[in-house]
């Protein structure tokens, strides 16, 4: 799976703790991240991470573009809901694209842990089925 990791500044330490705790799961997948988050995760865990630009400089949009091309399977976005973000429209667009393309999205540590444990248990294998067949968003 291709997993995107994004964290607002006040959540970066939490992302590092998450990546460290679930390194045994994350190491089996391709990781993508916005700039600073990706660098911090790499430094703390030694995991390879493809780093895009920092979120406010377009990194969120770069990950959004990957989602729209069906090149991301899961997004962990540890948001800081108590601080204003200068790139809030980009954040909203990324969340919207995750919904449009049926990409599992965690926006807090609780949902991130559940998604990662689900990946480990094989509960996200439906993404592999999508990659084998039609590349359009699911229609229910």
Curated annotation (Swiss-Prot):
PANTHER family for the chain: METHYLGLYOXAL SYNTHASE (PTHR30492:SF0)
SMART domains: MGS
GO MF annotations in UniProt: methylglyoxal synthase activity
Record EC number: 4.2.3.3
Keyword Lyase: yes
Function: Catalyzes the formation of methylglyoxal from dihydroxyacetone phosphate.
Protein name listed in UniProt: Methylglyoxal synthase
Protein's organism: Enterococcus faecalis (strain ATCC 700802 / V583)
InterPro entries: Methylgl_synth, Methylglyoxal_synth_AS, MGS-like_dom, MGS-like_dom_sf
Active site, per annotation: 60 (proton donor/acceptor)
Domain annotation MGS-like: ranges: 1-140
Record family assignment: Belongs to the methylglyoxal synthase family.
Keyword annotations: Lyase
Keyword check for Lyase: yes
Reaction it catalyzes: dihydroxyacetone phosphate = methylglyoxal + phosphate
Binding site for substrate: 8, 12, 34-37, 54-55, 87
One GO process term, biological-process aspect: methylglyoxal biosynthetic process
GO CC term (a single one): cytosol
